[in-house]
Curated annotation (Swiss-Prot):
CDD domains: PRTases_typeI (cd06223). It comes from the Bacteria. It comes from Neisseria meningitidis serogroup C / serotype 2a (strain ATCC 700532 / DSM 15464 / FAM18). This is Adenine phosphoribosyltransferase. Pathway: Purine metabolism; AMP biosynthesis via salvage pathway; AMP from adenine: step 1/1. Its EC number is 2.4.2.7.
């Protein structure tokens, strides 16, 4: 049974996200979603809020970004009765892959997807836990496009608006939906 979004507010999710100062480094206020995932009530709320948004949007596949996007994306795909595709850090997938690099604060990283994961013309929803600079999500969107997928939307629980990731994603031509927006993960 779905929890109707009006039964609990999105603000309840915000209250459940744990804030940890100076982690993983000094000056960062880390937003930890594990309390949401640990609670059957709040995890259901999170998934149901997304199900209600996407249940009538004719999605063919949900893709999730490594690693928390797997948790949210797989649960969402199950409820939408569609398949799930993992987009993993480079070197973690066993079959033929296509890769996309993206910039980090110091250096570069890459994500990969199996070459047969998205059929041309498939309508794809890309999911992650949060959007900071947007680099990982932009790389995931590019992988889906390389395989011929049509981006329905990119979705996340939380967007740090001051880091411009959401703006960059929207500028790439992909719509972005986030349940919560926050000024940022940098301590002021």
């Amino acid at each position: 049974m779905l929890v109707h979004p009006e039964a609990m507010s999105v603000g309840a999710l915000a209250d459940k996200i744990r804030k940890i100062e100076n982690w993983p480094q000094k000056g960062i206020l880390f937003h930890d979603i594990t309390p949401v995932l640990q609670s059957a009530e709040y995890f259901r709320l999170l998934v149901d809020l997304l199900v209600y948004r996407y249940m009538d949007q004719k999605i063919d596949i949900v893709a999730g970004l490594d690693a928390r996007g797997f948790i949210i994306g797989a649960a969402l795909a199950y409820h939408l009765n569609v398949g799930f595709v993992p987009i993993r850090k480079k070197g973690k997938l066993p079959f033929e892959t296509v890769s996309q690099s993206y910039a980090l604060e110091y250096g570069e990283a890459a994500v990969e997807i199996h070459t047969d994961a998205v059929k041309p013309g498939s309508r794809v929803l890309l999911v992650d836990d949060l959007v900071a600079t947007g680099g990982t999500m932009l790389a995931g969107l590019e992988l889906i496009r390389k395989l011929g997928g049509e981006i329905v939307e990119a979705a996340a629980i939380l967007e740090f608006t001051d880091l411009q990731g959401g703006k960059n994603i929207r500028a790439s031509g992909a719509p972005l939906f986030t349940l919560l927006q926050n000024e940022g993960c940098m301590k002021g």
